[in-house]
A protein has these predicted regions:
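Fe(II)/2-oxoglutarate oxygenase catalytic core
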Residues: 2-177
């Protein structure tokens, strides 16, 4: 996946909570690309495994994002869910409802830095090839869990490659351009 991603990389974006546009933002300095659902046999196999493991229909997943971090690149602490109080999030919420969980898969070992940190709960996950971290965003009473604040620490040496799968409450159907 890394080799297939290299030629497609672009600066990563975030959803602008005011407009719903996808904007480059200084809090997120990685590059990335994505693979559409079942774009190739490897992607289809990964998506089936995620679905079986987590008990979530394949259709509820956003495209697999491949993210690349070079030395100094990071993603400052943020939430992956969309705050419904922000007007720009209406567009992304219409594409399958709220994001409910994230799966981050580590595609390589990082020489130094690049851990996934959860500052509010004191968890620091080292990026090790073949490992993954999964987290859901709702509390037992169905509220969005602000303790899922997380970030990608700056890479100090080497590079970091991850595959991220965001899961929605319903089938994901992006709006037509």
């Amino acid at each position: 996946m890394v080799a297939a991603s290299r030629r497609k990389l672009q600066r990563s974006t975030v959803v602008n909570e005011k407009t719903g546009a996808y904007d480059v933002h200084p809090d997120r300095t990685s590059s990335g690309t994505h693979f559409e659902r079942a774009e190739n046999e490897l992607v289809a196999r990964i998506e089936r495994r995620i679905s079986e493991l987590l008990g979530v229909p394949v259709e509820n997943g956003e495209p697999i994002q491949i993210l690349h971090y070079t030395p100094g690149a990071e993603y400052r602490p943020h939430w992956d869910y969309f705050d419904p109080a922000h007007p720009g999030n209406e567009k992304v919420l219409a594409m399958g409802g709220q994001r409910v969980a994230t799966l981050v898969m580590y595609l390589n070992d990082v020489e130094s830095g690049g851990s996934t940190v959860f500052p509010d709960v004191g968890i620091d996950v080292l990026p090790r090839k073949g490992n993954a971290v999964y987290f859901a965003y709702t509390t037992v009473d169905g509220q969005l869990d602000r303790r899922t604040l997380h970030g990608g620490s700056p890479v100090v040496a080497g590079e970091k490659w991850i595959a991220t799968k965001w899961l929605r409450e319903r089938a994901y159907a992006p709006a037509s351009a």
